[in-house]
Amino acid sequence: DFALASLKALVENHYNVVGVVTVADKPSGRGQKLHESPVKLYAESKGIPVLQPIKLKDETFVNALKALQPDLQIVVAFRMLPEVVWRLPKYGTFNLHASLLPNYRGAAPINWAIINGEKETGVTTFFIDEKIDTGAIIAQEVTPIESHETAGTLHDKLMVQGAELVLKTVDS
């Protein structure tokens, strides 16, 4: 899971992660067994509070997030946030995106880079604003796309590179 690598990096490097927001548990598979996200399972194993809102503008969720008093919010592989959420922390909210923005904004940037025959891609951290993947860029790291690369192998490379960039961004 792309987001899990960044969360693990933050925890393993002793950052004070005051909470995690992840997707709500949902039924999947033949038996429609309730599936919990890897981010939720990891956070719970580390004693980190987990919020799983259905609607991000829900007053109960927003109040619970405010109660955590985050100084900074980091978004990885999640949906677009409403302004009431991304404006909350003192130092803002930044996102990790799996492309060299402004290229490949939006969904499936890894797939599109391969489909379009790009020779390189990378990861970007940027401050969230009103539009999708348009905020001020904080940092970028480039990685080559090898001729044998698949979306899966590139995903895994960018996941590791992205977690490292999240740490560099928090430290800057």
Where are these regions (language model features)?
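N-terminal glycine-/serine-/threonine-rich beta1-alpha1-beta2 phosphate-ribose binding loop
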Residues: 23-71
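Donor/substrate-binding cores of folate-linked one-carbon enzymes
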Residues: 13, 72-172
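Short beta->alpha connector loops
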Residues: 1-3, 54-57, 77-80
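Amphipathic, non-transmembrane alpha-helical secondary structure
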Residues: 4, 8-12, 62-66, 83, ...
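N-terminal Rossmann-like dinucleotide-binding module
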Residues: 1-31
